[in-house]
Regions:
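C-terminal capping/gating helix-and-loop segments adjacent to ligand/active sites or protein-protein/ligand interfaces
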Residues: 649, 716-798
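Conserved N-terminal structural module of periplasmic/extracytoplasmic solute-binding proteins
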Residues: 21-91, 95-104, 120, 126, ...
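Extracytoplasmic "Venus flytrap"/periplasmic binding protein-like
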Residues: 424-485, 494, 517, 603-604, ...
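Hinge/lid segment of periplasmic solute-binding proteins
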Residues: 458-510, 524-528, 632-639
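Extracytoplasmic/periplasmic substrate-binding proteins
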Residues: 100, 589-672, 677-682, 687-696
Length: 806
């Protein structure tokens, strides 16, 4: 059972919303109309020639008026959503049996009439029957929690106890209990959770009357996660399981209830998050075909699982789903080995659903798809009902393609939130496997209106004219203005006068050290770093960095010292680059912490390491490096030609609009929705800081939000210090201790100064010049070739590359 893992929002009423947008090409006049969005060739028109999907899955969203509703544990029984309420924070808030009617949109809550003597009760698993009665596995603790007994209980729909029995002996006190299921005959299956170890993992079997039958092991030492269940026939249940940490396949196991064993039906079942069975009428069922609806505890009855028309579901036995798509799948008939690959039906985002947080998927009597979503971080907890509708009958939207590398759940959440908020535009996230794939897609003119700038070399793409200038949009925005942002944020993403992107949050990476090493220099230059390294031959110049990483950092900040893109001249055979290679050769090939090895602070204290990489996600992070370098600590920056701009800014949720997009106005609306500070401005200070720390996981770009955060930290630390309390410490394995203190305004100012002089991070390992260096330099590092020979090879290869790409 999932735990109550976040402070609930205020109780909200049932909320209905219906969207009817489909990602399809608009008519020839499908531009934004007047304003900034006009002109250009729409990248999305590239998909107009592709076959339009015949079906659209139009969503309707419901929210149950219960702040203790657990969408992750809801079970569909007919047209009723059944669940056990989550444990409340207040004393005396017992869990209740809850039923929400999808037809009447009514919530019924029933208290349990417990027959147990123990007062401290914990429901750790449950399964509802077709008649809305429920089986529970209950942990019952003594008053001091020193004793534990386990019970299998059944309650009728009104909360009256029908039966209970002590199952402590067969289930044990230390076993890890997961989900439950009830098959078509009412028999009970209790699964161990994914935390069960080795041979302890398995299934406890109980008859429909609750009598213990056996425990059947999964028979593997690997971690086992139960994905879902389906009835293979009236006589047996099949369980889909995932074995190991990163499995390529799932396995389908048939439970032989009477034989007390598991039979492997399919060892290479698709690797999925969940599955849903399409119930067929007896006349349609073939030998070995599945015959009942899947849901943990959903059971089987003609009333609750009447088959939808095949026209609505397609010719499939099962529907499967993962983070991004829903698939149709034909399970092979009994005794047959051949199977078809899953067929993609639709993407979750097509229906404004973040598939990373789908908890359950099933089919209603009328053929609609039932989906539950529980995303605490983005406050998206709901039931979605999807109606299969012909695309031609759906009002079209203007579809915008957002190109991203390995777009994650957070990006999907932004797209879903935007798509639900309005009817004119839709964001479709297009994933690319690597930055190289993305760059190639841009080069070949693939459809895209927005680009996720995470790790992207914006300077290089700007030279190719890829981006639209965002400043005119920002200046005309009704909700944002240039002065709203922390000083330096807009400058960081302004390339040759063009504002490429605006992050909603950021983190910083720079080099920290003893500022006295710099002499009179304001910042660390490449020349000065090489001199310092030469003067300290026994010391590692920068701690905890590999050769490849060091070369990438140096090229990120100093590539222009060796390439003149205007003239095409390259200088990789120069004495300066040879000195760089000698410098990089002092770093390790890999980072391995050996037993008993001294910590980085101790090495710095002893002079064995001169500088350290500094990561800054909050203003107080500066104190760690003050603890390493003492009173003369400073953020000196990565080495650059003139000692300025030596800080990397890692952007959160920064998006650029492509110059070829016809829907620039719609693309800007999406960016506005990401940056809009209204919600954060309405939060109480403590809630705001919590949100920044755990959701942004970085520093906010909006100045008002940054100021409120810093004010809270300063005041909170002042109050803490006034009470005479300490601020904690960081202890290393060798005993070195860094003590923390109350945050100071000077430390905040240090962080803000770094922002003013930062440059956007990009993934240098995807840079073609860095790749060439990485391929050739190891021959020098390993002593296979001379420094001069390797430098000449790099010079020739890079020169050829520059000549081809100028």
């Amino acid at each position: 059972m999932k735990k109550w893992n976040r402070i609930c929002l205020l109780m909200i009423g049932a909320v209905l919303s219906l969207t009817a947008c489909q990602k399809k090409a608009d008519g020839a006049d499908g531009s934004d109309g007047s304003g900034l969005g006009e002109g250009g060739v729409n990248a999305s028109e590239a998909v107009a020639a592709q076959p339009e999907k015949e079906w659209t899955y139009v969503p309707e969203f419901l929210t149950v008026a219960d702040d203790r509703a657990s969408y992750g544990d809801m079970q569909l029984v007919g047209d009723t959503v059944c669940y056990i309420s989550m444990v409340g924070e207040a004393q005396g808030e017992p869990q209740k049996m809850c039923r929400y009617s999808l037809t009447r949109r009514e919530l019924t809550q029933v208290s349990f009439q417990w027959p147990l003597e123990e007062e401290n009760l914990e429901i750790c698993s449950f399964a509802f029957n077709p008649d809305h009665s429920v089986w529970l596995i209950v942990n019952a603790y003594s008053a001091d929690y020193s004793q534990l007994n386990r019970y299998l209980c059944r309650f009728d729909p009104e909360g009256n106890n029908m039966s209970f029995q002590d199952i402590t002996q067969e289930m044990g006190r230390d076993s890890s209990v997961g989900d439950m299921a009830v098959d078509g005959q009412g028999r009970i299956y209790v699964f161990t959770s994914e935390y069960a170890e080795g041979e302890a993992a398995g299934i406890w079997l109980y008859t429909g009357e609750g009598r213990y039958q056996a425990k059947v092991p999964f028979g593997t030492s690997e971690t086992v996660r139960v994905i879902g269940t389906v009835d293979r026939s009236e006589e047996s249940l099949c369980v889909c399981v995932s074995k190991g940490e990163n499995p390529e396949h799932c396995a389908m196991l048939e439970v032989d209830f009477e034989g007390k064993r598991l039979i492997e039906v399919d060892a290479e079942f698709p690797n999925i998050n969940g599955l849903c069975e399409i119930r067929q009428s007896p006349a349609d069922s073939a030998d070995g075909a599945f015959g009942s609806q899947n849901s943990f505890g959903g059971g089987d009855s003609a009333e609750s699982n009447r088959a939808p028309d095949k026209e609505a579901t397609g010719e499939y036995n099962l529907l499967l789903y993962d983070d991004k798509y829903v698939y149709g799948y034909d399970f092979p008939a009994e005794g047959k080995k051949s199977r078809q690959s899953p067929e993609e039906l639709f993407a979750w985002t097509d229906s404004d659903i973040n598939g990373y947080f789908v908890e359950d998927f099933s089919i209603l009597e009328d053929g609609r798809y039932y989906v539950t979503v529980e995303d605490w971080t983005n406050e998206d907890r709901c039931i979605a009902l999807l109606r299969r509708t012909r695309t031609e009958d759906v009002v079209p939207c203007k579809n915008l393609v957002l190109a991203a590398v390995d777009g994650d759940s957070a990006l999907a959440a932004l797209a879903v939130r935007f798509n639900r908020s309005q009817e004119r535009y839709r964001i479709d996230v297009q994933d690319y496997g690597s930055l190289t794939d993305l760059y190639n897609a841009i080069l070949t003119g693939e459809a895209m209106d927005l680009i996720d700038l995470s790790g992207v070399d914006v300077e290089s793409l700007m030279r190719q004219g890829v981006f639209e200038d965002l400043r005119p949009f920002l200046e005309q925005s009704e909700s944002l203005a240039p002065d709203d942002f922390v000083e330096g944020i807009l400058d960081t993403y302004t390339i040759d006068g063009t504002l490429v992107g605006i992050p909603d949050s950021f983190t910083l990476r720079t080099v920290a050290g003893d500022r006295t090493l710099l002499g009179d220099d304001a910042g660390l230059t490449l020349e000065r770093l090489l001199e310092i390294a030469q003067s300290n031959p026994e010391a590692l110049p920068i701690g905890e960095v590999t050769k490849n990483e060091m070369m990438q950092y140096l090229m990120m900040f100093n590539q222009d010292a060796f390439i003149d893109w205007e003239t095409g001249e390259c200088r990789f055979d120069s004495p300066q680059f040879q000195a760089v290679m000698e410098f990089v050769n002092r770093f390790p090939d890999s980072l391995e912490n050996l037993p008993g090895e001294d910590s980085l602070p101790r090495k710095i204290h002893d002079g064995r390491v001169l500088f350290a990489i500094a990561e800054i996600r909050r203003p107080g992070n500066i104190q760690r490096y003050e603890g390493m370098f003492g009173e003369t600590a400073a953020c000196v920056g990565f080495p650059t030609a003139d000692g300025s701009g030596g800080t990397l800014l890692y952007a959160g949720n920064a998006f650029g609009i492509t110059a070829t997009s016809q829907y620039k106005e719609g693309a800007w609306k999406f960016i506005e929705s990401v940056l809009d500070p209204k919600e954060a401005e309405q939060m109480e200070p403590e809630e705001l800081v919590y949100s920044i720390r755990w959701e942004l996981n970085g520093l906010p770009s909006v100045k008002k939000i940054m100021d409120r955060m810093n004010e809270y930290y300063l005041e909170d630390d002042r109050e803490w210090a006034a009470k005479g309390r300490d601020f904690g410490f960081l202890t290393y394995e060798d005993g070195w201790i860094i003590e923390f203190h109350a945050l100071t305004q000077e430390e905040i100012d240090t962080v803000l100064e770094l922002v003013k002089d930062a440059k956007p991070f990009y993934s240098a390992e995807e840079d073609d010049v860095v790749k060439i260096i990485g391929e050739e330099a190891p021959a020098y590092y390993r002593g296979q070739k001379s420094l001069e020979d390797v430098a000449e090879i790099i010079q020739n290869r890079v020169q050829l590359y520059v000549n081809e790409h100028r």
